[in-house]
Amino acid sequence: MSSYNSPHAYYPHDNTIINISGSDNTTNINTTTINSTSVDQDIHYYEDGTHYDRRNTHANCNNYNVGNGIGRNIIDNNRHESIRDCNESIRNVLQGRLNRSDNSCRLDVNSQILVGVGAPANSCGTNGDIYIDKCTRDYYTNRNRIWVFVGNLECREQIYGTGGCKGEKGIKGELGPKGNTGQKGDIGSKGDRGDKGEPTISMFSYINSYEQSVPGGFTSVVPSKATIAYISCVGGGGGGSSGSGNSGFHGGGAGGSVIKYPVSVVENQVIRGTVGAGGSGGQVGTLGMCGTDTVVTIGTLTITAKAGLSPTETSGGDGGTVIFAQGMFSPAIAKGGTLSSPSGSNGNVGFFAFSGAGGGFRGGNGGNILAFNGGKSQGPDTAGGGGASAFADGGSITIRGCVTASKGSGGGGAIQTGPVSISGVAGNGGNGYVRIDYYSQ
């Protein structure tokens, strides 16, 4: 067996020297001192790299076990390899170089392995030296005092032992502390302005109302913060007529009506007007009386709800209409019933305005308007019923006397003699009515 002198490794940062010596097939590496920790016994390497004896051999370098990471180790028949730090990488290089059968790859006598950080400078090292960057694992060889990059130790083929059994699942760690609340996000950009809606009552706040159903003048002061007033009113209804035989017992017409007509107002503004009266019913031989108009004045605007008319000898009373300012539409007048068409005409619909229904001729019913019905007749030979207003049913005739009309409806007619004994006094027309609702915008 021929012997040769092996190189030694020099660590410039901790002044640790690893001496390498051997003969023929076996190489001994004697580690003298690594961070003041001594080596128990030599480490024996065989050149074929398949076996070595480990007899309590170890050395500590920066608290890592160096002896466990050298070449291909056989410990208790288990093959393993580990690379944990720069010192282990050095030994892998040594193992690879020493395991080569090609003598040209062996380290020259007195060459050394240097370990540092970064690429080596040509001013250090001699021909045949090896330099390892312990951070990147790059290694170089010195060729005639010029360092030549060779490769990276991490790329060398590694041999691992047979995988062991899968360990038990570890215990779930404790829940970490809750993180801090994130910062509030920026306010988003302002959206486009929506289309203007149509004005309705629901867009306004109700304040209060003024009402009067007694005939005569009235005054209403616009309350604080009010910006709009809704006007509702009706003229007085016409009284019915009474007669005997085959003439004179017809129903009266109803007054014209206005419902929730909107008007702009300001606080403390004064609204004045007059509530119309219902016409009185006639007696035998006399005709009933017409009602009177209801008038509402707001600044320069005047609204007139015309009264219902009393019957004539040949027809029931006509219904009243509504007159606004000049140029505004008024609903058509509803005519009273006649001999050829005994029932009164129904009221007509206008712009926030409604004409009163006509009164019935003898034996005919009064006309209808919206949800209200005309007064009822008791048959062909009985008196006619009064016309309905947009606020109340028309007056009727019964065996107990006339049903009193209200809120502008027409009075029922009366008859003195006939199949059924009826009172000779006809019904009165209903009085007029005013209501003003105030809202703020």
Curated annotation (Swiss-Prot):
- Start and end residues of each Collagen-like domain: 164-199
Taxonomic placement: Viruses, Varidnaviria, Bamfordvirae, Nucleocytoviricota, Megaviricetes
Basic and acidic residues composition-biased segments: 187-198
Q: What is this protein called?
A: Putative collagenous domain-containing protein R238
Q: Which domain of life is it from?
A: Viruses
Record region (Disordered): 171-198
| Keywords annotated in UniProt | Collagen
